[in-house]
From Swiss-Prot:
Catalytic reactions of this protein: L-arginine(in) = L-arginine(out)
Lipid bilayer topology: Multi-pass membrane protein
Source lineage: Bacteria, Pseudomonadati, Pseudomonadota, Gammaproteobacteria, Enterobacterales
Cited InterPro entries: Arg_export_ArgO_enterobac, LeuE-type, Lys/arg_exporter
HAMAP family given in the database record: ArgO
Keyword Transmembrane helix: yes
Gene designation per UniProt: argO
Name of the protein in question: Arginine exporter protein ArgO
Pfam families: LysE
Cellular compartments per GO CC: plasma membrane
Origin species: Klebsiella pneumoniae (strain 342)
NCBIfam families, per database record: 2a75 (TIGR00948), PRK09304.1 (NF006801)
């Protein structure tokens, strides 16, 4: 059964490693050392729920509801554009230290709400967990399926806590104005690139629904 566990672990790691809104948010909270472990836990728990839903049958709901998929996609586009704009606005702020200080003053609940939006409004999360993991894990028998799910869940917990702790450890070097400017430019550009890719998919969903 450990074979299925490591298959899930490897696949989960491959899907979670690329820079996306979730990773960018966890990294930034780690750099600020602001509720970073709590955010890592909430991200991992969110992944746990999505992974279990995808592998144990929830994928059928998304695949059989094209309108739901279209709504999720365009909601994700809007959120990623907003998130990318915020990062680029901070990067090109004339007083970067003041902009960073304003971000640091965000309350716990605002940070939690942003984290939930970053996770649950990201269509790629549903495609990864419901489509990819759902199609692969759904073919397994009950016991192997549990080990496969445990492997992918382990990848999420290891990655998010590792990323948060590493970012907090490197915080003294990454909190400089130059480093913050570079990080925010990269994050903003990546968010807008993902939004553009999702918009193309969203247009395809709309055209398919109208045909």
């Amino acid at each position: 059964m450990f074979t299925y566990y490591f298959q899930g672990l490897a696949l989960g790691a491959a899907m979670i490693l690329p820079l996306g809104p979730q990773n960018a948010f966890v990294m930034n909270q780690g750099i600020r050392r602001q509720y970073h472990l709590m955010i890592a836990l909430l991200c991992a728990v969110s992944d746990l729920l999505l992974i279990c839903a995808g592998i144990f049958g929830g994928s059928a709901l998304l695949m059989q509801s094209p309108w739901l998929l279209a709504i999720v996609t365009w909601g994700g586009v809007a959120f990623l554009l907003w998130y990318g704009f915020g990062a680029l606005k901070t990067a090109f702020s004339q007083n970067l230290e003041l902009a960073s200080a304003e971000v640091m003053q965000q309350g716990r609940w605002k940070i939690i709400i942003t984290m939930l939006a970053v996770t649950w409004l990201n269509p790629h999360v549903y495609l990864d967990t419901f489509v990819v993991l759902g199609s692969l894990g759904g073919q397994l028998a009950v016991e192997p399926k549990r080990w496969f799910a445990l492997g992918t869940i382990s990848a999420s917990f290891l990655w998010f806590f590792g990323l948060a702790l590493l970012a907090a450890w490197l915080a003294p070097r990454l909190r400089t104005a130059k480093a913050q400017r570079i990080i925010n430019i990269v994050v903003g550009a990546v968010m807008w690139f993902i939004a553009f890719q999702l918009a193309k998919e969203g247009v395809g969903h709309i055209l398919a629904l109208l045909n």
